[in-house]
Amino acid sequence: MSTDPQAEVIARLFKPRSVAIIGASGDPQKTSGRPAAYLRKHGYAGKIFPVNPKLDHIGDWPCYPDIASLPEVPDVAIVLLGAERAHVAVRELAAIGTPCAIVLASGYGETGETGAARQAQLREAAGSMRILGPNTIGLVNLTDGIVLSPSGALEMDQFPVGHIGVVSQSGGILGSLLSRAAARGLGLSKLISTSNEVDLELSDFIHALVDDPATRVIALYIESVRHPHKFREAALRARRAGKPIVAFKIGRSEAGAQAAVSHTGALAGSDRMYDALFQQTGVIRAQAFSDLLDISAALATGRVLHGKRIAILTSTGGAGTLVSDSLGLLSFETPAPDAATAAALRALQTGDHASLDRNPIDVTLAGLQPTLLRSILKVLLASPSYDALTIIVGSSGVAQPELMAGAIQECLPLSDKPVLAYISPHAPAATSILTQSGVPAFVSAESCAAAFAGMWHVQQWAAPVTETATAHAGVVTTDLPTGPLNEAQAKQLFSRFGVRCTRELEVSTPQQAEQAARSLGGPVVLKLLSSTVTHKSDVGGVAVGVTAEQVGERLQRMCADVEHATGTRPDRFLVQEMVSGGTEWILGMHRDPLGVAILLGQGGVTAELFKDTALRLLPTEGGLGRAEALAMAQSLKCWPLLNGYRGRAKADVNALLDAIVAFSNMAAQLGEQLVDAEINPLFVLPEGQGVCAADGVATLR
């Protein structure tokens, strides 16, 4: 038994010895009558205590008039009362020492201020008792046949029991996933609807499923992550335990994000921040809702994809091309068999009608012969040419769905390579039979490819190396103003944390500008100095390649241009050394409900045009390490520009990594004091010459 009190409570939720049903009904057609009916139907062996002052009995169970009358403290209570009365029952349950209550009522934080106040009242009433919900559909322990839910999706006589644990912030989606899994023969272990998460939330159940021996894969339907640090800790623990997480995050569009907020009353982070969170924690993001179960099904087999070479075995050429194309789009390879494999295949079948020496391997109508199929499978599974196998079921799957299943199932123990199936026709029976036989079957070529991609993600992902960024203890910022900093002030801040910045002088007159240019030497850059104008070039506030002889006149012209564009005559300027050579990058920070992220991408005036950027969330403490900084840079499409693209000189990547680490350390150390910050451009010079911040903005509180 775990010594963690929360783990013990969730263990009781999954497998309670007794259940109280507050507001129970004797009518199994009603929502209030279903929990008791489902518990009986699926053979629950524990005690059931219905509570309803209007009834003496519900079936064989005595019905109690109130919570105080219960014969013992239940492990779990299901509260079926409306939002206006649920908190009273919760308070009474807490008073008798009930470990946990499931509150189904809606009308809480998802409805606005009044509902939020009601939700706070519910939290206060619970005291130390744990709450699942409100606005939840409950949970189901399919492993042990324990139903703590009134969902109509649970009317089925037999649950599809397997190794996928599902946590959803939507109760309705939970029922949808159960029915979809059952229809395709895909087994699940646990189903949990967290919904408003007044107490127990997503991360708590990730931890619980990591500890659950029946669960191999964790599938999440996410509307918002309310506690990012807890989520990160739980997700990394799952990966260390060898239990991959697949997540479908709603809210990728503005409309979807607004709908998610209105559904649970939680602030949603930006979608790209979720990409960063998932990437850093090894969570596989399902791009389509159907991928959530598809990828999970492949991972639940426990088979490992060690390479990207896929054999396609088909009896229909068109479907083989579909699968090959879908795999190619995700960077998988479908090579022809090696000479020995091709010879072994040709020895099994003769005639021009077969295409056994290419990939897809097309057995045509001979695929209907189980003996031949069995022999071909053995050859392909043993072949060094392939890391995995896709079997395509053609029209034979409609009339005789069991035809291929037996042969495939017999061959599976011969190899630990992943084997997936694509069902080309509409053949639900074939899908179910193959999936139950240990071969996840998919109804689209794209889903099959996505499943392989999920398996490859698990194999390739490595936990981030924990590094401590160089500390800059005692960095003084009290001399800098609060609010938006001008460029000179922002670069003072950056340089104090270790980012090299351009040499520059502040001027107000043409004469001062000329003196500054001569002092710096060579052509210079003349800039407007302002804390309110961010995009200086848009208002005529930047001039490059200006000589000392030209700079005075150029300053006067800039005054006129800026005044015309903004309505205000400027009186402060920067004369700055020109940086030549290298490539321009953007290095910034972004604050979000999910946390603070560091952004790296192609910079200069094209930054917003190309939008080639990478994000990394800061860890709980400290900045990013060099390994994470390098991973950021290498993930960009423009990484080759740093790495000697087409004979160009290699850039000073080490200096760039130092700058990323320093900048992130600044964001971590200043915390809430730093509202935003950005360097654009950050010049990354040729190897050995370092980097140089040529412009930047920052805002301090």
For each feature predicted by the language model, list its residue ranges:
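Catalytic-core regions of core metabolic enzymes
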Residues: 1-701
